[in-house]
Amino acid sequence: MATEMQAAPVLSTPDSLILEATEPVARQNATRTLSDEELSITYDIERTLQEIRQARYKRIALQFPDDMLPDAPRVFQLLSRGLACRDVDKITVEKNGNGTGGVESEKLAQDVSQLSVDDKPEPEPKLYILADTSYGTCCVDEVAAEHVNADVVVHYGRSCLSPTARLPVIYVFTHKELPIEPVIQAFKATYPDQATKIILAADVTYCDHIPAVYARLMEEGYTNLYATELIHCPSSAIPNRTVPDSVRENPDTLSEWQLFHISDPPTALLLTLASRVAAIHIYPTTDAPSDNVKPLPVSTSAALGRRYAILTRLSTVPIFGILINTLSVKNYLHIVEHVKQKIADAGKKSYMFVVGKLNAAKVANFSEIGGWVVIGCWESSLVDSKDFWKPVITPFELELALKGDHERVWTGAWQSDFQSILDQPAEEAQTADHEESPNDDDDMSEPESAPPEFDLRTGRYVSHTRPMRNPAPRVSAQSDDAVSAASGPAAARALARRAKGELAMIGGTVSPGAEYLRSQRTWKGLGSDFDIQYDDEDPSDSTLVVEGRKGIARGYTVGDSIEKH
């Protein structure tokens, strides 16, 4: 039998606990214990200093991701020391010269002495740490760099390698250790046939190990290996990687090759290569070092099927939101205009938003938006989170979503780089629906004349899938006075009643957003449980106003009855 409680349970900690250091404030990062020499190798200090000196940059912005910020002060110190003694060796050599070419040197000295030039000292280079990026950490933050008027950005960590619009960039992917022998053993277990066509690739933080792995495998007897190299081309057959010569001449031959990738690639890369290569195997690097690591085969059929289901859901959406998720990627303004034009050609409405770092809470404020199109780098454009209320797609997926059900063909191919969309040739003339004039009284004069459209996911009929194709509103008048009012100045037509089913107008332009606010976000007050009818419409019975209860709490009477309740 359970004993009775002698005292109330303690549901809070004592006040003195806040004065005791029971746990460390933050977990110490292992890289903070590295020596200066190890840190210099990890962050490639010498190469960074060399590129800064050659280009004579004076204002250098250092962009670190969040996980590398603890090392930022030490990297800053190492770069500052290196830049402080940049010209010591050069000055020493000039002072200790052997005097060769004395005649030319004397003549040059005389010419220089005759010039009246102010001998001002060259300004010292200044370093700035960019702690918080405006968008994704994989992209170069030109916006933050321009706040300090930087000449160059040094980007640390993994990067999408998207071309920038304004500032030059020095990429430092950092160096991570990778035991070579376990990689070789895992490769041999995965590909026992040494004649198989295999492409070696790695994440940017492990790409410096590819030459060593390639040389070791060639010694083992593999004959059809290709080691990729980094390039700045997201539109390549393998994004940001070189490809074999045969693939460069004929991209379709990439399907004959298998891909062995070191470290987990981004999801956008997996979906892009799913239909391009024969198979993909990933060598994981997140686990503890072991000799029994097995490469994992990749299957993207479920992810691609989910993306296609999103497209069918968005085919009947009347309003799209364009999310600007970058201000640094080259040609981002061109793809914004391209997307706006595509949405307008489909008879739909688009609104543009710049929200900085994307999250579900920000876009949930705009409930009238049926789907979002992200304009960003080829990695950050893919948003596959279930936290978002409305789907988020890429410009490539938008092209498929805007096509009709009879034109949309899903081949399994997928891409996230918008530059390939801009490089596509111009499409043929639009269909006859696009060419029809909205001023013709016989064409699309009534909503019933348009073919019905249904949501393929729910089966529901959608009345306004292409609101921007509706004809301009016309005032129906039965009398001469009404006709003159409709044809008069704008002031005379200000109180003209909107036709039933017609969308709201702002400045003479159809506004689906305003219509959503009018119909979905407008409170009609008391009595809004029935529709207001006009004189020329069939009246409908509404609830009569009757006398309710009256009295005090001790007893109420209803109407003329004297009985109390």
Curated annotation (Swiss-Prot):
Binding-site residues, [4Fe-4S] cluster: C139, C160, C377
Pathway: Protein modification; peptidyl-diphthamide biosynthesis
Cofactor note: Binds 1 [4Fe-4S] cluster per subunit. The cluster facilitates the reduction of the catalytic iron-sulfur cluster in the dph1 subunit.
Positions of region (Disordered): 424-458, 464-483
Top-level taxon in the UniProt lineage: Eukaryota
Subcellular location: Cytoplasm
One BP annotation, GO: protein histidyl modification to diphthamide
Pfam families: Diphthamide_syn (PF01866)
Keywords annotated in UniProt: Cytoplasm, Iron, Iron-sulfur, Metal-binding
GO function terms (MF aspect): 2-(3-amino-3-carboxypropyl)histidine synthase activity; 4 iron, 4 sulfur cluster binding; metal ion binding
Chief place of localization: cytoplasm
Similarity annotation: Belongs to the DPH1/DPH2 family. DPH2 subfamily.
Described function: Required for the first step of diphthamide biosynthesis, a post-translational modification of histidine which occurs in elongation factor 2. Dph1 and dph2 transfer a 3-amino-3-carboxypropyl (ACP) group from S-adenosyl-L-methionine (SAM) to a histidine residue, the reaction is assisted by a reduction system comprising dph3 and a NADH-dependent reductase, predominantly cbr1. Facilitates the reduction of the catalytic iron-sulfur cluster found in the dph1 subunit.
Quaternary structure annotation from Swiss-Prot or TrEMBL: Component of the 2-(3-amino-3-carboxypropyl)histidine synthase complex composed of dph1, dph2, dph3 and a NADH-dependent reductase, predominantly cbr1.
Name used for this protein in its record: 2-(3-amino-3-carboxypropyl)histidine synthase subunit 2
Species this protein is from: Aspergillus fumigatus (strain ATCC MYA-4609 / CBS 101355 / FGSC A1100 / Af293)
Protein's gene: dph2
